[in-house]
């Protein structure tokens, strides 16, 4: 259904989310970022308020794990949710509800989390993690590399229709790139990123 990465660039304190799905309009639902605070991807049976409320909880001083537990506690549909959170300190939390469609899962790395559901196989998130860890490019490019690797490994079993790349930083220009209802949204997202960088 959706595969995503949330990450922190420890040097610039930039947070970001890259995401792709076989549905439309992923950019307005899944990724949530705030400079100096953190990044959240909320997917599965997407509850947009998890992103909005989650960032507010982080801003109030909750750790990602505490924020996640608070969000899930009163949610009767929690087992249908998939949520990954990283804060500006690099602390992380992840939840993949058992009612998400297979393959479902997440991997927590040093300064990132990858997650997905309704994927071709576990290799999707494994390859995403490898691509991000081994990337030598700038932070935004590494987020995109993770998406490309996920797609190459099989991605969403339905194929991808929309993708987004969102970052926030106090010292770098914010990125908010979205591609919707496209036959190859990740490729188009890469084109948009390069176009944006050429403007800078």
Language model features by range: what are they?
Residues 1-200:
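N-terminal nucleophile
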């Amino acid at each position: 259904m959706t595969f995503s990465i949330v990450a922190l660039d420890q040097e610039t304190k930039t947070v970001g989310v890259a995401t792709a799905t076989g549905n439309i309009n992923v950019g307005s639902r899944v990724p949530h970022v705030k400079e100096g605070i953190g990044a959240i991807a909320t997917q599965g049976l997407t509850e947009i308020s998890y992103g909005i409320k989650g960032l507010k909880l982080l801003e109030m001083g909750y750790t990602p794990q505490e924020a996640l537990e608070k969000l899930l506690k009163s949610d009767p549909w929690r087992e249908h949710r998939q949520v990954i959170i990283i804060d500006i300190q690099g602390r992380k939390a992840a939840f993949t509800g058992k009612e998400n469609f297979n393959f479902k899962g997440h991997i927590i790395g040093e300064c990132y989390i990858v997650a997905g559901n309704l994927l071709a196989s576990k290799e999707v998130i494994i390859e995403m993690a490898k691509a991000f860890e081994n990337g030598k490019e700038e932070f935004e490019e590494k987020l995109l590399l993770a998406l490309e690797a996920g797609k190459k490994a099989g991605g969403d079993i339905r194929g991808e229709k929309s993708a987004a790349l969102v970052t926030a930083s106090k010292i770098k220009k914010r990125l908010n790139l979205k591609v919707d209802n496209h036959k190859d949204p990740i490729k188009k997202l890469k084109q948009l990123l390069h176009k944006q960088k050429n403007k800078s």
